[in-house]
Amino acid sequence: MPPTITFWGVLASPFQLKMQAIADACRLEWRRFPAQANLAEAWMTLLRLRLDGQLGRIRRFGGFTPGLDEYPAVPYYRIDGGPFYYDSSDFAAHLASVEPRAAALIPDDPAMAFVVRLVDEAFDEWGLYMVHHNRWVTSARTNRMAADLVVEMG
C-alpha cells in the first residue's frame, strides 16, 4: 500500500512546493496542513510538532548535522503518521526507501546522483533568493503572498 504523506507548511514556501511536486511525480497522495486539515487535525498536528521540536524528536532523513542544518526553518513532513522530518532535499531519498515508485527519482549511477543533488542544492540556495526577491520586493505592490500568508496562518 502506498504511503500516506502529510506536509506541514505554508503555501508560499518553495520548499513545500518542491516536496509536493516530488510526491506528485511518484503519484502519491498527500495532504498539506494546516490548509487541508480540519480544526482538530490542525491543532493536534501543531501541538505534536511543537512538542517533538522541544524534545528534539524531529528528524532529518540521512542524519542531522549540528550547526549546519536549517531546522526548524523549513517545512515538515510525515509518512504514515510516523515521526516528523524536515529537509526537502532528502525527501526524495526518504520516499525511495519506503515506496518503489519513488526509486526512479534517484539515479543509480553515483555521478548522475551527485549531479542531481548538486542541481537540487544549487537551486535551493540560489534559486530561492530569486523567488523571494521577486515575491517580496519586485512584486510587493501587486503580489498577494503576504496577505495570503496572514490568512493561511491566521
Model segments located where?
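GST-like domain detector, emphasizing the conserved glutathione-binding G-site
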Residues: 1-154
